[in-house]
From Swiss-Prot:
It comes from the Eukaryota. The gene is RRP15. This is RRP15-like protein. There is a cross-link at K108, K179, K208, K239 (Glycyl lysine isopeptide (Lys-Gly) (interchain with G-Cter in SUMO2)). InterPro entries: Rrp15. It comes from Homo sapiens (Human). There is a cross-link at K239 (Glycyl lysine isopeptide (Lys-Gly) (interchain with G-Cter in SUMO1)). One of its GO terms (cellular component) is preribosome, large subunit precursor.
């Protein structure tokens, strides 16, 4: 019996090896359908392959060999799935690297990050802003060059003097305007109702008249100064009128003489000389 059992096993193995390929395909198809229904992940698929392998072990020893042959393709499929996912990631990385490392011409803005035209424009705008800021700083520095904040405590007296001068100038200006208006009104009244005379009078009024009035409103100081100058001018005029005793030293010597009187003036001194000599003899 012991010898018969090994012989039967060998015969069964030979029969299984001689079975047609159709039966093997049917078995593998059934295993694949069971695996697809039960497996949700790669780990579940491995568990399902193990369960099917146990099932076939319990049925027969011959099917054990077939299940082992089927389990190996399951492991290979999982490995292939992992390799395919890694391969797709590597392909994506290679494609992105090619795109990023690709040298594009500057005239064609295909990739905005690699386009240097925009960078040049940004740098140009930045330089223009910096130049504007520098120009503004220079202008402010020029305007604030000689400006000094006044000190209220130290410059108190000078500020008072300046205020007095300003008030005097304003008062003098308004007084001059009022006086000039009065003068013009008086002249218009003197002209009467004739429009021609009024137009002629208004045309004669000019800026110089107002400036002369404004200069005449300097106050008592100008009047006293003018009164002091007048006597000096009179004294000089009197001295010039008296002049030197000898007529030759005068400035107007021979200015009013005519050609017909040339002999008379020359005879005068000659006639006087003998008279003086006769007087001396007597």
């Amino acid at each position: 019996m012991a010898a018969a059992a090994p012989d039967s096993r060998v015969s069964e193995e030979e029969n299984l090896k001689k079975t047609p390929k159709k039966k093997m395909k049917m078995v593998t198809g059934a295993v694949a359908s069971v695996l697809e229904d039960e497996a949700t992940d790669t780990s579940d698929s491995e568990g399902s392959c193990g369960s099917e392998k146990d099932h076939f072990y319990s049925d027969d020893d011959a099917i054990e060999a077939d299940s082992e042959g089927d389990a190996e393709p399951c492991d290979k499929e999982n490995e292939n799935d992992g390799e395919s996912s890694v391969g797709t990631n590597m392909g994506w990385a290679d494609a992105m690297a090619k795109v990023l490392n690709k040298k594009t011409p500057e005239s064609k803005p295909t990739i905005l990050v690699k386009n240097k035209k925009l960078e040049k424009e940004k740098e140009k705008l930045k330089q223009e802003r910096l130049e504007k800021i520098k120009q503004r700083d220079k202008r402010l520095e020029w305007e604030m060059m000689c400006r000094v904040k006044p000190d209220v405590v130290q410059d108190k007296e000078t500020e008072r003097n300046l205020q007095r001068i300003a008030t005097r100038g304003v008062v003098q200006l308004f007084n001059a305007v009022q006086k000039h208006q009065k003068n013009v009104d008086e002249k218009v009244k003197e002209a009467g109702s004739s429009m021609r005379k009024r137009a002629k009078l208004i045309s004669t009024v000019s800026k110089k008249d107002f400036i002369s009035v404004l200069r005449g409103m300097d106050g008592s100081t100008n009047e006293t100064a003018s009164s002091r100058k007048k006597p000096k001018a009179k004294q000089t005029e009197v001295k010039s009128e008296e002049g030197p005793g000898w007529t030759i030293l005068r400035d107007d010597f021979m200015m009013g003489a005519s050609m017909k009187d040339w002999d008379k003036e020359s005879d005068g001194p000659d006639d006087s000389r003998p008279e003086s000599a006769s007087d001396s003899d007597t």
